């Protein structure tokens, strides 16, 4: 086992929190898998390669410090937005709550995305449906704590517009009627319905909600898949001690040309019992 893995394992054994950021995937060059078959495969590949890169650059000073929060970054790929170009860019994000039942994860994710990209505000954040137990139908009560936090972030000007994902007409209507800050978009997975449901289309049109399509799996990142990626990258670790709390995927698009300038992932994980 390499020294890199031992040092990384020692740090992870003492830390309570892991922040992982891939930087701009467009800057990865040959490191990036050319044709990942799924979003889940791309994500897992990104997690492993970011962990490997971080492990290989651990300094003796860091090992002596044993920080409580580990910043695991693909350092050469980090790219902040030039303030002079900010008005020309649209910064969008999709937030996936994984192993957290705390709505504060929403604020943490948005704050971290703003910091990583060097911006004061995100133009749009779509919230993937929070995890619920098998056999339980998603209800307004499941969405409310996360949506309230998104509303707070809109009111404090950290986000311009907020949207939902995979809500049917009834769920979207309930959220719309209850919410102070209304959803301006709802993503629909075309793998589950080849044609937009007419009742959803009619409701969205009536209330000026944009219907978008996506092809994310129901579970983009599971606790098990994260732990497997962690174990493979850093064998000298008790990977089952670590739980991913949330994952944020962002993209930066040049408005006038519609091209992607930057895209990447940010993730927060916590060690159990810490």
Curated annotation (Swiss-Prot):
Cystine pairs annotated here are none
List every position bearing Phosphoserine: 59
GO BP terms: namely: apoptotic mitochondrial changes; blood vessel diameter maintenance; cellular response to fibroblast growth factor stimulus; cellular response to follicle-stimulating hormone stimulus; cellular response to glucose stimulus; cellular response to hepatocyte growth factor stimulus; cellular response to leukemia inhibitory factor; cellular response to thyroxine stimulus
Output the InterPro entries linked to this UniProt entry: Gclm, NADP_OxRdtase_dom, NADP_OxRdtase_dom_sf
**Residue numbers of N6-acetyllysine PTMs:** 263
The alphabetized UniProt keywords are: Acetylation, Glutathione biosynthesis, Phosphoprotein
> Which residues does UniProt call coiled coil?
none
Drop me one GO molecular function for this one. Answer: glutamate-cysteine ligase catalytic subunit binding
Q: Which GO terms describe its cellular component?
A: glutamate-cysteine ligase complex
How this chain assembles, per its entry, is: Heterodimer of a catalytic heavy chain and a regulatory light chain.
The family this protein is said to belong to: Belongs to the aldo/keto reductase family. Glutamate--cysteine ligase light chain subfamily.
Task: Give the protein's recorded name.
Answer: Glutamate--cysteine ligase regulatory subunit
User: Which species does the entry assign this protein to?
Assistant: Rattus norvegicus
Gene responsible for this protein: Gclm
């Amino acid at each position: 086992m390499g020294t890199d893995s031992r040092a990384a394992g020692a740090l992870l054994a003492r830390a309570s929190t892991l922040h992982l950021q891939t930087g701009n995937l467009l800057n990865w060059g040959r490191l990036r898998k050319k044709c990942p078959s799924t979003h889940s495969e791309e994500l897992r590949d990104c997690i492993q390669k970011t962990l490997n890169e971080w492990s290989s650059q651990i300094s003796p000073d860091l090992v002596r410090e044993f920080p409580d929060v580990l910043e695991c970054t693909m350092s050469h790929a980090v790219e902040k937005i030039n303030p002079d170009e900010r008005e020309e860019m649209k910064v969008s994000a999709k937030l996936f709550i994984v192993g957290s039942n705390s709505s504060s994860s929403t604020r943490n994710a948005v704050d971290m995305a703003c910091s990583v990209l060097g911006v004061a505000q995100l133009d749009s954040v779509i919230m993937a449906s929070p995890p619920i137990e098998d056999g339980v139908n998603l209800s307004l009560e499941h969405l409310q704590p996360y949506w309230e936090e998104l509303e707070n972030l809109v009111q404090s000007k950290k986000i311009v517009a907020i949207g939902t994902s995979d809500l049917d007409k009834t769920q979207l209507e309930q959220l719309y009627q209850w919410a102070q800050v209304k959803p301006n978009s709802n993503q629909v997975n075309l793998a589950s319905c080849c044609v937009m449901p007419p009742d959803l289309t009619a409701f969205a049109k009536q209330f000026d909600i944009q219907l978008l399509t996506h092809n994310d799996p129901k579970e983009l990142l599971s606790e098990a898949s994260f732990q497997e990626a962690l174990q493979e990258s850093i064998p000298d670790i008790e990977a089952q001690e670590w739980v991913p709390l949330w994952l944020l995927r962002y993209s930066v698009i040049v408005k006038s040309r519609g091209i992607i300038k930057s895209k990447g992932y940010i993730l927060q994980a916590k060690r159990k019992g810490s």
